[in-house]
Amino acid sequence: TDLLHENPNGSSNLYFSFSEFAYFDIYILKREGADKDWDAFGKRLNRDILGEVAELKKTMTADDDRKLVENIIVKTQGFVSGNIKEDEERPVELFRELLLLYKGVTKEQLRENMKYFLSAIMPTCEEYGMFMCVHPDDPPFPILGLPRIVTCDEDIDWFLHAVDNPHNGLTFCAGSLSAGGHNDIIKLANKYAERTWFVHMRSCHIFPNGDFTEASHLGGRADLIELARIFEKVNPNLPMRVDHGMTMLGDENRGYN
């Protein structure tokens, strides 16, 4: 919800606020059933998210709404899929239309689609020596009425066994996985290192209320030093990159983050 959250030390990073995202979902996107979804999700977090949203609504301005749309739809979707451009005049309406494409799609259907796709491309991967690596859902929990299928140990285990071929592997994104309090990052790394073909070295810190932010390379829930040891031991030639993290001292203009 905030792509340039300011930290006390002067750096900035990504910050995910459940109340702000729920406000966006309910009052800006106006998604059908959003209030019920967030009420249920709040109970899982032991938070009154609908109450927080009601209080937030009292202070949100038109400019605040515009910034949320810019962060959640324009910049994020433009980066991930390219479906929404920076100069899009009706980003909210277009985003609604894109979400409708998945209306009624269940987790089981998404899993079967994934299995179908991976099974279909394995012969080509084997022929040309290519290794596919699935990136975990980010964030690793259902949002916007969409099911998620790569969020935890059980999900990873499922897709690796559904298409049990060494060319079907995992992108171990420590940042995405560590944003979920249900994930033990070191345990996952040890379990799936042999089927991991790419590593994103990033760490998230989860606050007591469930909100999360990107942490420094020595902080957060993902022990990046231990992760490097685990993957280097199993596969010394495994591609790893630090991924985006805290922006400081002009990094933003150089593309480091």
Placement of each model-derived feature along the sequence:
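Helix-loop segments that flank and shape redox-cofactor active sites
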Residues: D138
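Histidine-acidic metal/acid-base catalytic patches
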Residues: H5-E6, D25-R44, D48-D64, N71, ...
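Solvent-exposed N-terminal domain segments of exported/luminal and surface proteins
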Residues: H5-Y27
